[in-house]
Amino acid sequence: MLMFRSILFFTVFISFLNSFGQVYDGTYKIKKQNPKAAGCAPPTTTTYLELNNVRAMVHTAGNLWQVPNQNYSQYEVPKNSGINALFTAALWLGGTDANNQLKLAALRYRNGQDYWTGPLSKVQAETNYENCNKYDKHFITTQDAIREFNAWYEAGVNDQQNGTNTQSELFPDYRVPDIVKTWPAHGDVSQGQDYYLAPFYDYNGDGNYNWQDGDFPWHDIKKTKECSVDRSVSLYGDINFWWVMNDRGNIHSETGADPIGMEIRAQAFAFASNDEINNMTFYNYELINRGTQTLYNTYFGFFTDGALGDPYDDYVGCDVNRGLGYYYNGDNYDGDNSGFKGYGYAPPAVGVDFFEGPYQDNDGIDNAFGIGHDEALNGIGYGDGIIDNERFGMRRFLYYSNTTNGANPNQTDPVNASDYYNYLRGFWKDGTKFVYGGSGYISDPDANPLVPCDFMFPGNTDPLGWGTNGVPQSNWTEQTANNTPNDRRFVQSAGPFVLKPGAVNNITVGVVWARSQNGDPFESVEALRTANDKAQALFENCFKVLDAPHAPELQIQELNNELILTLSNPVNSNNYNEGYEEYDPFIATADPNADKTYNFQGYQIFQLKDTKVSVSELSDPTKARLVVQCDIKDDVSKIINFEFSDELNASIPVQRVNGENKGIRHSFSVKTDLFAQGNMQLVNFKRYYYLAIAYAYNNYKNYTPDDPTAIDGQKKSYLASRKAAIGEVKPMEGIPHFPQPESGGTVFNLSYGSSPQITRIDGYGNGNRSLEFDDATLNSILANGYMENPTYDYGKGPINIKVVDPLNLA
């Protein structure tokens, strides 16, 4: 996790230089690098991905999360906690040509550089300084902005067809975002680049990007893409960073290897959510081989350096079936260390799910799933009836340790190209195979030198012995091996395969974080597996998520020992005028007439313990407590979701709403601190935090777990806001205080909920309300028998009017 310092930097760099001249290493060759290169400078752009409960630093230079040139990282989760879970990550790619010459690109801490920005030419995989510099940026889009642009454009099309003014009425001040206008949809064909570069939706199908024709960066806002059969790459996530890299911009000073000629179109993306997905980020790499040579024994890997709070007390492990590699703490307390802030008691686990890797070599059949000949361990496309669409999953999982911490030098950081390639293939730096047990090294007395393995520390997730030549082994984790916790790194690798010129592959990974409140650190790994299953389901659904009703805008008026909370929905909200409805394509039922639409049902407002509480933690009473709930007055009150329990291995009922069923309200008086002990009255000048969400309801069929005719019923009738109309759901702060100083000393005599006296000037009827005249009107009627303009008592008039904001009365 930590970068090499002082003289160690110099030593490692010298070993890099020496490796340039190495002729043979094992079964392949490394030749001296050709000094001719494009002369590109190292990329410098850095952007924070921080839509949800994670703050992640993303670079255009090829690695992730590490603060450039510092022994510090920025993969902070929970966001605003000051605690980081990971240090850095990068792609490792390597293979040999027909002459056994190794070609490889990799990165760790950018002590050297193997990746640069910009596309390559299609023929000779060429680039230049100007091209690299031009693309040293993240092209950032949000699904909200793209959806709004599409709605604006289609409103204009509708106006032209029908002579209406919908566009100007619904979007009076709309401006097309610059990213839509300047989207890098096309490469420079004069330099031999691919005409089609960044993915875009071609509205009129003319093959050219023009936003004035309705084209836009291709977020699948209509949710029509079928990723199981469509190989094209769209943009994913509520927010997306897109950029393009290559490994031909200059000499490989990280590994010393010859370049491959790889063009890499990268994405980093995230979703705002109200569940475990709120603690995740995702990364997709489309890899196009622009090189002219076929590479054999090719491996693609994803390297991750963990820093789970204190980086010096971590363990690693993997879940073979899930394709998941993870870090967890070596004991039940994660303290502060060397400037790194720890998680404390019951520390979390963090993992990387290797969703998809490169395509398996074509063999003319649809490979199945299992351990037989040509069958897969994990991955996608196996046994789906489609020939030659199989993609590797995690085929190897390996770890190594920080060079500076006294570890076996053969199990430490790579220092030359052969080390990187050995790790990708499943060998230690000295060329010995990984073996099962102990530390995985052949001389370890607790390791079995007769059992080579592909997956280090799989626990009990490899019951068929996929990683041990079909011979099942006993449970093996770092805990069971009693290893010394250390500063770990791991690599998830896929291969071998043949990489041909022009071949297009994808690597997609998801970073998952979870925390158990139990003391044993491995309990957080179990929680991580549950969270990872949601990440896997999201990937398998093409990263399509239900939007859910947007959270309302929450405003707070501060009064003496009182806060007034008001809710509203802006015009760009999918719940404007409380009109949210959304079709759920994932509802599976044999009933063709089943109602598959969620509709707006109500609001919930929570008091939060502090600003660190995210929307995914609202069910934790130590962090969030329900202040108020209101819902449509109908036959729906209590709403139950059936949620899977790993402990019980069954779906259990969880009450999400106990509805008051009295109708929708938009303003609320709060005088009570739900986290206070003793006197619960709000205290002036104290900070309080609130968060509001909307929720929708669908119950196409009652779910009954013990009724075989009802097990296809609705398990999740309650669907809560996962985001706002723009961006994440954010808490609001309120500080009660005397309001007079902010209004020039004016005293306010009306309070929240008060109704004014109403005088009838004209009209008739009671508005379906109980009416009462004031005393003056009654006395006039008794004296004169008639009152031309009667005045009604407070709150007893024919019109229902109440004071919502006492400070906003004229």
Mark where each language-model region is.
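Bacterial Sec-dependent N-terminal signal peptides
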Residues: 1-25, 733-736
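Extracellular/surface-associated beta-sandwich interaction domains
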Residues: 22-810
